[in-house]
């Protein structure tokens, strides 16, 4: 699959990572980047919850094996409109994959939630 980076050549991987680094520099120069990180592969994920008896961490492997989609990274941007966020997401979507061809990555766009006002 074009999404399985284990099958990419080193040059393809370098081109992809280079694209993402350059993209982050562009967002920073545009004054919209709040934060961005790539994440480790899903095989390194762990699911943690508090133990019911003593609250100690209970750690299991995750995510679930049947999951085919996963979060590879994220950006937090500060923009004036949803349309501006969509345009930025479309730019990220064309990151190169195998053979240098655009991947057309599906980018999920969500607003950062605001907490309801708390009365003193």
Residue ranges, per PLM feature:
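Conserved, structured core segments of small domains
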Residues: 1-120
């Amino acid at each position: 699959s074009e999404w399985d980076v284990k099958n990419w050549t080193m040059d393809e991987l370098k081109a992809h990572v280079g694209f993402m680094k350059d993209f982050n520099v562009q967002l920073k120069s545009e004054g919209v980047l709040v934060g961005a990180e790539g994440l480790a592969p899903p095989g390194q994920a762990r699911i943690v919850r508090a133990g019911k008896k003593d609250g100690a961490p209970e750690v299991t492997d995750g995510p679930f094996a049947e999951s085919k989609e996963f979060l590879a990274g994220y950006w937090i941007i500060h923009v004036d409109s949803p349309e501006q966020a969509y345009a930025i997401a479309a730019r990220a979507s064309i990151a190169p994959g195998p053979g240098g061809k655009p991947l057309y990555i599906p980018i999920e766009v969500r607003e950062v939630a605001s907490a309801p006002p708390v009365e003193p």
